[in-house]
């Protein structure tokens, strides 16, 4: 199998190489060959126009002829505008189509009907014989001329206000002493030298075609095709919208059978239904993004603040001593090192925790404080019962240790216990601490 695939790939590459040698320089994504920098042949252009006349969409024409969609759209757009399928000249400058005469007619049409569209002006230029299919300006060129007219009127200032009123009243005359928009611009109010009569209907005479033989018939057919292919926005009824929304709730990506069934049900073309679902999915993605943003904002605002204090319900409360205990670690350890002399005053009560699982904490035991001894190979951290100095015994509670001295067990580590003798009246700890050290 790998050898067969390699053979097929080698055959395809050799075929492409042979095509490139025969004046072809590339293969597009659809599998069609083209010559880079050169226009399509006239036969392919004629097929594109014929398929468009038969009702095929540009995307279908692109797949049928294996020509890129942009190329098909560009050729059809130029054909609708000029009626020509010939490519434009390669290199050089284009001839100027916005001549002073054409600019004057455009200004005249704009004065007669301020709401006229650029494509209507273009049709009037063709119908009145001002331009031909070869030198007719495009819609973008007409819009550019209209923008220049508007900017020129804004720059007139106070002196131009009177001229604007004259234009609105339809009075003939010049545009004041200012020069035209282009050098040598003809006066808009003067009649055309070609003898073309001015139409009084404004934009209503856009479909009137001058009878010039075969060119007139061809132009009329082309304009009708252009009006047919340039559709308006589809208006959906409430029943159609409900059916589409119901299908969208079922699935966001209906197959061709579902679209055809829905098209027969609500009397809409399948292509319109496909476009509606594409737009509806885009709208749903925008709404979903907003919902996620709101959900994140609500979650961040409803977070519970973290408390730095421990819950008191976990540990058993320990009774606090009535008198603050004050002692020095140096006196307890029997050492005179100044670095270890730290005064503890008013220490909070801390429970004594053990690692023994079977030894519960007795509530009657007194609180203990954890003292960290110096690091040694055998001693790490130990917990001792509360040491009460002799001068503090009178202020202790009756539940504290008796003065005669009681024996308790101080747990050092898991499984190890050391008996601790708490002296009652002797301040000397020499008999006690050496045992631990």
Swiss-Prot record:
Q: Name one GO biological process term.
A: anterior/posterior pattern specification
Q: What one GO molecular function would you report for this record?
A: DNA-binding transcription factor activity, RNA polymerase II-specific
User: Residues annotated as region RED subdomain?
Assistant: 101-149
Cited InterPro entries: HD, Homeobox_CS, Homeodomain-like_sf, PAIRED_DNA-bd_dom, Paired_dom, PAX_fam, WH-like_DNA-bd_sf
Q: Where is the composition biased (Polar residues)?
A: 187-213
Q: Which residues bind DNA?
A: 23-149, 229-288
Major location category of this protein: nucleus
UniProt lists compositionally biased (Low complexity) regions at 295-313
Please list where the region (PAI subdomain) is annotated: 26-82
Q: Where in the cell is it found?
A: Nucleus
Biological role stated in the UniProt entry:
Transcription factor expressed in spatially restricted regions of the neural tube during embryonic development.
Q: Which family does it belong to?
A: Belongs to the paired homeobox family.
Name of the featured protein: Paired box protein Pax-6
């Amino acid at each position: 199998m790998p050898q067969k695939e390699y053979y097929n790939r080698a055959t395809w590459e050799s075929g492409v190489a042979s095509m490139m040698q025969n004046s072809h320089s590339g293969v597009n994504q659809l599998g069609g060959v083209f010559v880079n920098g050169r226009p399509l042949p006239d036969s392919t252009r004629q097929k594109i126009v014929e398929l468009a006349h038969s009702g095929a969409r540009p995307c279908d024409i692109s797949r049928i002829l294996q020509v890129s969609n942009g190329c098909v759209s560009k050729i059809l757009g130029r054909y609708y505008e000029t009626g020509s399928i010939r490519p434009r000249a390669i290199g050089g400058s284009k001839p100027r189509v916005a001549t002073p005469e054409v600019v004057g007619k455009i200004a005249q049409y704009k004065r007669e009907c301020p709401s006229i569209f650029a494509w209507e002006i273009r049709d009037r230029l063709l119908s009145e014989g001002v331009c031909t299919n070869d030198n007719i300006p495009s819609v973008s060129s007409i819009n550019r001329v209209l923008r220049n007219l508007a900017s020129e009127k804004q720059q007139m200032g106070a002196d131009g206000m009177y001229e604007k009123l004259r234009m609105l009243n339809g009075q003939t005359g010049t545009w004041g002493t200012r020069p035209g928009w282009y050098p040598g611009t003809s006066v808009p109010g003067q009649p055309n030298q070609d003898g073309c009569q001015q139409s009084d209907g404004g934009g209503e005479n856009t479909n009137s075609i001058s009878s010039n033989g075969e060119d007139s018939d061809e132009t009329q057919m082309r304009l009708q095709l252009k009006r047919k292919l340039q559709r308006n926005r589809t208006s959906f009824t409430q029943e159609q919208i409900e059916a589409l929304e119901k299908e969208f709730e079922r699935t966001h990506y209906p197959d061709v059978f579902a679209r055809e069934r829905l098209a027969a049900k609500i009397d809409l073309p399948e292509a319109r239904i496909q476009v509606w679902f594409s737009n509806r999915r885009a709208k749903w993605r925008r709404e979903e993004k907003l919902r996620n943003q709101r959900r994140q904002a609500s979650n961040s605002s409803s977070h519970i603040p973290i408390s730095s204090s421990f819950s008191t319900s976990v540990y058993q409360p320990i009774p606090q001593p009535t008198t603050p205990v004050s002692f020095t670690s140096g006196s307890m350890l029997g050492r005179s090192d100044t670095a270890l002399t730290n005064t503890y005053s008013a220490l909070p009560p801390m429970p004594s925790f053990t690692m023994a699982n079977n030894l519960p904490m007795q509530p009657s035991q007194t609180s203990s404080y954890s003292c960290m001894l110096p690091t040694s190979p055998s001693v790490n951290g130990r917990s001792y019962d509360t040491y009460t100095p002799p001068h503090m015994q009178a202020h202790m509670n009756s539940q504290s240790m008796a003065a005669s001295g009681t024996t308790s067990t101080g747990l050092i580590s898991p499984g190890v216990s050391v008996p601790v003798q708490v002296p009652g009246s002797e301040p000397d700890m020499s008999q006690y601490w050496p045992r631990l050290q």
